[in-house]
Amino acid sequence: SCYDLCRPCGPTPLANSCNEPCVRQCQDSRVVIQPSPVVVTLPGPILSSFPQNTAVGSTSAAVGSILSEEGVPISSGGFGLSGFGGRYSGRCLPC
């Protein structure tokens, strides 16, 4: 035999080498990779408000037609709070 033991792992000089194969497994290298912190930004909720118009005391023709369609009699020149009487159910009018 050429050598009883294989040469150490790594580059070796070519001097004093022979042609007999020598297989040696070096110990495994261990590398610890720690993940870097990741910051994730989540968008917050979008809050929007729309003010609602109040129909009390309005003289608009559109409001008048809505009220007359729902069975509340109004005069052509507008209406006051007395026009609701006992028929006002407390429902909100559509904008």
UniProtKB/Swiss-Prot annotation:
The entry's keywords: Acetylation, Keratin
Modified residues (N-acetylserine): 1
Gene Ontology terms: cellular component: intermediate filament
Keyword Acetylation: yes
Signal sequence segment: none
Annotated Pfam families: Keratin
GO molecular-function term, one example from the UniProt record: structural constituent of cytoskeleton
Assigned protein family: Belongs to the avian keratin family.
Subunit structure: The avian keratins (F-ker, S-ker, C-ker and B-ker) are a complex mixture of very similar polypeptides.
Protein name: Feather keratin B-4
Organism of provenance: Anas platyrhynchos (Mallard)
